[in-house]
Amino acid sequence: MIIRSPEPEVKILVDRDPIKTSFEEWAKPGHFSRTIAKGPDTTTWIWNLHADAHDFDSHTNDLEEISRKVFSAHFGQLSIIFLWLSGMYFHGARFSNYEAWLSDPTHIGPSAQVVWPIVGQEILNGDVGGGFRGIQITSGFFQIWRASGITSELQLYCTAIGALVFAALMLFAGWFHYHKAAPKLAWFQDVESMLNHHLAGLLGLGSLSWAGHQVHVSLPINQFLNAGVDPKEIPLPHEFILNRDLLAQLYPSFAEGATPFFTLNWSKYAEFLTFRGGLDPVTGGLWLTDIAHHHLAIAILFLIAGHMYRTNWGIGHGIKDILEAHKGPFTGQGHKGLYEILTTSWHAQLSLNLAMLGSLTIVVAHHMYSMPPYPYLATDYGTQLSLFTHHMWIGGFLIVGAAAHAAIFMVRDYDPTTRYNDLLDRVLRHRDAIISHLNWVCIFLGFHSFGLYIHNDTMSALGRPQDMFSDTAIQLQPVFAQWIQNTHALAPAATAPGATASTSLTWGGGDLVAVGGKVALLPIPLGTADFLVHHIHAFTIHVTVLILLKGVLFARSSRLIPDKANLGFRFPCDGPGRGGTCQVSAWDHVFLGLFWMYNAISVVIFHFSWKMQSDVWGSISDQGVVTHITGGNFAQSSITINGWLRDFLWAQASQVIQSYGSSLSAYGLFFLGAHFVWAFSLMFLFSGRGYWQELIESIVWAHNKLKVAPATQPRALSIVQGRAVGVTHYLLGGIATTWAFFLARIIAVG
């Protein structure tokens, strides 16, 4: 007789038709809130409507319903992303010079926008080469398209249509999974299954399919393009996929098919899965064969990772067990209880994800220039500068968002009665030590980093260059950074015996790659000037962390306001009669943190922009002499505050200031307009609510006199609303000003 264990029952993980589809609610603004649904008495109503529309926590306490709304909203977000992507590809297909650029990427600039001549606007269409007049773009799309093997505008059209189909599909999915088959809470909390599917499916199979595309489509097409074959003569992607002989002509080992794979004779594939390092001298990008190898390796790692967690079969890791076992001799209960936090608080979950994604985005910024992945990206200086700046800003915003949601978690989801002596509780109990030490570090870094500059400015003003900190007087060499550079430069043939070149030319070793007479990349020297500005980076980052971390650790209570948790995430002050308690809410810490994030990222992108123009980017003569854009002035000029103002901001702003009447004039107008937006923010940040209320009341009086007073009573912005409008315009104005300054400069000289 055979005894069988009972079959595990299949869990029903969705509710059918939970909420009927109706457009009636769309006609009722604020249907999610009793107060807002009543309609406006005062103008504050419209602000509250916007503040709470997406705050699902405030609509209901039911975690399952909140989860479904978030899940459905994600499909809406994906739909918008597909729509945007489709628009990018459509512009490439309809308005761009992509095919011309593909035939001569060193002399023709990428353009995918032509301005209609209405009243003189055609001035914006500059000559980008090859007889095409349009706006030079710096998004890097052309380079990505070439790397992926797109050779015609028809292919871009097809991809654009495909993205539209996916956008529609995502909208449908968002509706379907909220109204027709909505997942139960248990489904959202099944972390092992989620990990397996995301790791093996998204990252594993995603990387594998990309590696497959690169091997079967990108590599052969790029091989032909690099050899100078006319794009129209190159076989189409499906021909390479269906006809193995075509590929075998380029890579002979293809003739053997999968035999080497199954006989473990993998070295046969070394023709198209390489480990070379360095850059392809033809395109100035990473070797595409290295990139294909990389994606294959990543795919294998994540396919393994996606089979590690325990689901229906009772084998593998359980996240709860891992977290509860994770405790050391000095950490009390360790991560006990963290599993419950992360499966019931989506704010805690989001906070971790934002912190990691933000850090990763900044890592991407640094790799895009030091290991340029796409062909002809490294010599397109405008695109290089744009990609670095863009990824730095995005990373900064995501990290501030991490602190914001950590604080919301503390206020809304943290239950102090169930937490004792785990890591989070221990951190909260010695938060005073953490914050006061961090504060000391900030003061130390601030005085010392800035003090080095002030010393140099003073010595410079007094005519004592021999007493300055510089590479030619008192040297402060970044010896640790130089040691790391050197280690990596020496790695090929030593610690990395298989590689023919180091991972990045920036490490050193004397190699230089130039494409079409322009420098793609060369070893980046680090000296006293970099040492000084790196300490400014350390200072601004630590202050940002101080503000954000204080906001999180004191989100629920402080000596000043012991019952802060009852006041919520954002509140102006602790009520009347308690002076000196304004601007202490967790929201206010996020508000203040944003300004320091802006400071931190600004210094980083200024450093990058000047350093690259001074020491990397430039032209190379037939004799091999490199002439940099600003002639290597970074090392001696950036060591004083005056140098930054005079030789960077002022000297390099000449292009944007003098852009009027040229094809760059739009940048001049943006430069002016964005300064205005920035200045407009100060009106909200520097004046109080009462000032505006008084002004409004006299304006209302005038309207009453003329019998044109509105039914909705005008109100001044609340304190929090005013600060929100202020910081938004401050950041928007500042970022757009920087954008116009950078692009006018680099398009003119690059």
From Swiss-Prot:
Lineage, please? Eukaryota, Viridiplantae, Streptophyta, Embryophyta, Tracheophyta
Assembly mode: The PsaA/B heterodimer binds the P700 chlorophyll special pair and subsequent electron acceptors. PSI consists of a core antenna complex that captures photons, and an electron transfer chain that converts photonic excitation into a charge separation. The eukaryotic PSI reaction center is composed of at least 11 subunits.
One biological process term from GO is: photosynthesis
Q: What does this protein do?
A: PsaA and PsaB bind P700, the primary electron donor of photosystem I (PSI), as well as the electron acceptors A0, A1 and FX. PSI is a plastocyanin-ferredoxin oxidoreductase, converting photonic excitation into a charge separation, which transfers an electron from the donor P700 chlorophyll pair to the spectroscopically characterized acceptors A0, A1, FX, FA and FB in turn. Oxidized P700 is reduced on the lumenal side of the thylakoid membrane by plastocyanin.
Q: Name one GO molecular function term.
A: chlorophyll binding
Q: Record the organism.
A: Eucalyptus globulus subsp. globulus (Tasmanian blue gum)
Protein name as it appears in the record: Photosystem I P700 chlorophyll a apoprotein A1
Q: Which HAMAP family match?
A: PSI_PsaA
One GO CC term of this entry? chloroplast thylakoid membrane
Q: What class of enzyme is it?
A: oxidoreductase
> Which of UniProt's keywords are assigned here?
4Fe-4S, Chlorophyll, Chloroplast, Chromophore, Electron transport, Iron, Iron-sulfur, Magnesium, Membrane, Metal-binding, Oxidoreductase, Photosynthesis, Photosystem I, Plastid, Thylakoid, Transmembrane, Transmembrane helix, Transport
Family in the record? Belongs to the PsaA/PsaB family.
